[in-house]
């Protein structure tokens, strides 16, 4: 147990799927898993462990932003000995070639955040951290098997949701970042630090280019494909 997770060690599987919203974790568990059990509810950050195609998997929310996912992913990897975390979330498109509902496999994440430095991770000069190559390849293979189109590349991991400095977003576009989100860089930093595996997969919910946005009811339906993709991946990793 930790100050933020009260599950017993054996209650958490070695592969954890992490949406930002704990209610989305609940939805995935109830919709797709057999016999899901609530194993954490500290601070409302729900976690469920259950079976998918006979394999034990945990689904847990991580909250919003680098500090939040930094805490939860670190504690899962460090104290619960989780081997793999796959973040499944939403993002804002930074390139005009991306459409709403597009799937992104975030092979790389760039951020101006100091989180990785504070954790003692050796950050390269370009401030880009990598997802686990094995997970990137597994995501692509599984997406192809499910006939899901996807984009693979760099995402910009932002600290401020209500970003005022437009030059930062312009710089992200110049770096050819596909989209902006708020957690991948910290997740990859923790995986590097603790020698674990991590990947972020995202669905485009908004566009900072066209200013289009998915209504709430469509976001849930679109998220379904990514949830199934992540579960199929997890079942191959356990």
Swiss-Prot record:
Binding site for a purine D-ribonucleoside: 4, 181-183, 205-206
Superkingdom, natural source: Bacteria
Keyword Glycoprotein: no
Molecular function as annotated in GO: purine-nucleoside phosphorylase activity
Protein EC: 2.4.2.1
Broad class of enzyme this protein falls into: transferase
GO-annotated cellular components: cytosol
Reactions that this protein is recorded to catalyse: a purine D-ribonucleoside + phosphate = a purine nucleobase + alpha-D-ribose 1-phosphate; a purine 2'-deoxy-D-ribonucleoside + phosphate = a purine nucleobase + 2-deoxy-alpha-D-ribose 1-phosphate
Keywords: Glycosyltransferase, Transferase
Protein name per UniProt: Purine nucleoside phosphorylase DeoD-type
């Amino acid at each position: 147990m930790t100050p933020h997770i009260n599950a017993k060690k054996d209650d958490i599987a070695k592969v954890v799927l992490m949406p930002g919203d704990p209610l989305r974790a609940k939805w995935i568990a109830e919709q797709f898993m057999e016999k899901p059990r609530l194993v954490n509810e500290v601070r409302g950050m729900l976690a469920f462990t259950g079976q998918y195609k006979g394999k034990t998997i945990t689904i847990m929310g991580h909250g919003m932003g680098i500090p939040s996912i930094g805490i939860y992913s670190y504690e899962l990897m460090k104290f619960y000995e989780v081997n793999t975390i796959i973040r499944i979330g939403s993002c804002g498109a930074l390139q005009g070639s991306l459409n709403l509902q597009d799937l992104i496999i975030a092979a790389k994440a760039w951020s101006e955040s100091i989180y990785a430095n504070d954790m003692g991770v050796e950050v390269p000069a370009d401030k880009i951290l990598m997802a686990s190559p094995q997970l990137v390849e597994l995501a692509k293979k599984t997406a192809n098997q499910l006939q899901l189109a996807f984009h693979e590349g760099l995402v910009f991991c932002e600290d401020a949701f209500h970003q005022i400095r437009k030059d930062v977003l312009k710089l992200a576009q110049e770096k050819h970042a596909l989209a902006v989100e708020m957690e991948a860089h910290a997740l990859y930093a923790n995986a590097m630090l603790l020698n674990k595996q991590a990947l972020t997969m995202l669905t485009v919910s908004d566009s900072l280019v066209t200013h289009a946005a998915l209504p709430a009811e469509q976001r849930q339906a679109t998220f379904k494909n990514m949830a199934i993709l992540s579960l199929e991946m997890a079942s191959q990793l356990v």
